Regions:
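Acidic, metal-coordinating catalytic segment for phosphate/diphosphate chemistry
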Residues: 1-17, 83
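Short secondary-structure boundary/capping segments
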Residues: 10, 18, 98-102, 121-123
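Residues embedded in well-ordered beta-strands
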Residues: 17-19, 25-26, 109-111
């Protein structure tokens, strides 16, 4: 007998997020989900998660960036490798342009800073609003507001934003993550 009450198969998409930081601030925008979020989005075909995170940062903010604060990748000979994310989140989302029904995003989360040194670059003006959010604002746990849009930060955005700022501080000081170690027996 065939079951008719079986749940629909779960649809999952791979996404990448880049917490863009500069001098004690992280960039967040008002997302259509009604939340303040960092730049991010779906991986394009043949794109690795680092490429996706950096592309999303550039597309959404206009700022070229580089990844910081990742764990030491395991080096295995001359094989290509991708920097590991600082975290991987799984988020249930409503329908979007990639799937009309609710689904999950498996999100590769990276920390990044502007590729070029200098003063904090301007963020896009308009809709959706973008903000450079300070470490003090993240620690205050007060809702963020821009115009008519106000909402508390999701706990993971607050925690990851603070961690990204700390990694950016270490990166500027030259005391970031250690260099990759070669695998035993690798040339």
């Amino acid at each position: 007998m065939e079951r008719t009450d079986a749940p629909e198969p779960l649809v999952r998409h791979f996404t990448a997020t880049g917490f863009l930081t500069h001098d004690g601030y992280t960039a967040l925008h008002w997302h259509r989900l009604g939340k303040w979020l960092p730049p991010g989005g779906h991986l394009d075909p043949n794109e690795d998660p680092v490429q996706a995170a950096l592309r999303e940062i550039r597309e959404e903010t206009g700022i070229a960036a580089r990844v910081i604060g990742t764990a030491t990748p395991y080096v295995r000979g001359d094989r290509a490798r991708v920097a590991p994310p600082v975290s991987i989140g799984i988020y249930r989302v409503p329908g979007d342009s990639h799937a009309p029904a609710a689904h999950e995003h498996i999100d590769f989360i990276y920390f990044a800073r502007p590729a070029e040194p200098g003063p904090r670059p301007p963020l896009p003006v308009g809709d959706p609003p973008w903000l450079w959010v300070s470490e003090a604002e993240l620690r205050a746990q007060a809702p963020l507001a821009s115009g008519e849009r106000e909402a508390p930060l999701p706990d993971d955005v607050r925690a990851l934003g603070l961690a990204a700022i700390e990694w950016e501080r270490r990166d500027r000081a030259g005391s970031g993550a250690p260099a990759p170690a070669a695998a035993p027996g690798a040339a």
